[in-house]
């Protein structure tokens, strides 16, 4: 693509928790903001203050005390299209300050999403925002590209959904994809619950954001859960304190590793699913026996929920225990992995070979929204 921002493609990774958006060819997203739309709880409290009927992203976050916050993307699937349009509008006009009708736009989606979801995305892009061209890419595949590989298995854990996606020579293997509706938001809810057991009360949507911050700053994955529980019970070495916005200081101990342990033991929150180490193993076992070696040696972590300290070592330990004893197992945890989907999109959209892959406005007008299934896979 050209260096000027005039025809550069836009890359927008719509996560359940954060929107990452920017220009193809950049090495990091220009805009990262929460996928939140907030509406005033009480109409007319701020009469004459020029109060808006809705706020998006950081502005919604900063006014969360007077708003009800909603996430239009749940478990990686867009559930509220009106709010989603507001988020896209905010992305183009306020964050990136571009006219969408001048830029091809690459969007991302979770694997195994309903077909109607990507059709509606396509329709809104062409009909509401009038983009000249667009493409929908699978998030985990982009993460793998960002790590410089075309073969491997990606554990992509975000705020709304977690996936194990085996990719061979650049193509996701759909029959072996494992999807787990357990991710960052569930961990935040679980942390709210176990902090309440300690006597701290967090209930509102605004307080949930405080707990999310506690989770991001203080939680970690234990290498051996039982040992860590014993250590926490016998000494205060694992305790950390956190100052709430009102100045009150709370102490958290074993909650620090009990919260992310849920990824390995979903029964903690009453889910009957296998943990992320087992789903990764099951996913590999569904692949052809000849490529398993390549997958074991290329376990790539991606997404914000893989940012816990200790998660790579624990994955290594758990998968080694499941795999054949002679198998070489490698977990790759790139430091920029919370943005690796976006980075992969930036790489893909700026490749010269990709330029013929875009769905153009003309193709859309001829074939309608279903074109997306033929051109994006």
Curated annotation (Swiss-Prot):
Protein's job: Actins are highly conserved proteins that are involved in various types of cell motility and are ubiquitously expressed in all eukaryotic cells.
Catalytic activity of the protein: ATP + H2O = ADP + phosphate + H(+)
Modified residues (N6-methyllysine): 86
Residues that bear N-acetylcysteine: 2
Keywords per UniProt: Acetylation, ATP-binding, Cytoplasm, Cytoskeleton, Hydrolase, Methylation, Muscle protein, Nucleotide-binding, Oxidation
Organism: Cyprinus carpio
Additional comment: In vertebrates 3 main groups of actin isoforms, alpha, beta and gamma have been identified. The alpha actins are found in muscle tissues and are a major constituent of the contractile apparatus. The beta and gamma actins coexist in most cell types as components of the cytoskeleton and as mediators of internal cell motility.
Protein name (record): Actin, alpha skeletal muscle
């Amino acid at each position: 693509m050209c260096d000027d921002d005039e025809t550069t493609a836009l890359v927008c990774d719509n996560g359940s928790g954060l929107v990452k958006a920017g220009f193809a060819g950049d090495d990091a997203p220009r805009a990262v903001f929460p996928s939140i739309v907030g509406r005033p709880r009480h109409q007319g409290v701020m009469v004459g203050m020029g109060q808006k009927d809705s706020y998006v992203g950081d502005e919604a976050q900063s006014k969360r005390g007077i708003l009800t916050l909603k996430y239009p993307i749940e478990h990686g699937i867009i559930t509220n299209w009106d709010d989603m349009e507001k988020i896209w509008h905010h992305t183009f006009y306020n964050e990136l300050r571009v006219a969408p009708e001048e830029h091809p736009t690459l969007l991302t989606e979770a694997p195994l999403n309903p077909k109607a979801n990507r059709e509606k995305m396509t329709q809104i892009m062409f009909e509401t925002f009038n983009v000249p061209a667009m493409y929908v890419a699978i998030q985990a595949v982009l993460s793998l590209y960002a790590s410089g590989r075309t073969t491997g298995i990606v554990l992509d854990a975000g705020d709304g959904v977690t996936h194990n996606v085996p990719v061979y020579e650049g193509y996701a293997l759909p029959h072996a994809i494992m999807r787990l509706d357990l991710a960052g938001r569930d961990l935040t809810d679980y942390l709210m619950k176990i902090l309440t057991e300690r006597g701290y009360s967090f209930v509102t949507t605004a307080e949930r954001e405080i707990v999310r911050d506690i989770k991001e700053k203080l939680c970690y994955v234990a290498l051996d859960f039982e040992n860590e529980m014993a250590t926490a019970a016998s000494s205060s070495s694992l305790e950390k304190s956190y100052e709430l916005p009102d100045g009150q200081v709370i102490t958290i101990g074993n909650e620090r590793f009990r919260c992310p342990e849920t990824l390995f033991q979903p029964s903690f929150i009453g889910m009957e699913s296998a943990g992320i180490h087992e789903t990764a193993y099951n996913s590999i076992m569904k692949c052809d026996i000849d490529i398993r070696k390549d997958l074991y040696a290329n376990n790539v972590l991606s997404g914000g929920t893989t940012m816990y300290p200790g998660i790579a070592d624990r994955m290594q330990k758990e998968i080694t225990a499941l795999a054949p004893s002679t198998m070489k197992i490698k977990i790759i945890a790139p430091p920029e992995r919370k943005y690796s989907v976006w980075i992969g999109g930036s790489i893909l959209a700026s490749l010269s070979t990709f330029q013929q892959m875009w769905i153009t406005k003309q193709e859309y007008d001829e074939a309608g929204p279903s074109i997306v299934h033929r051109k994006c896979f």
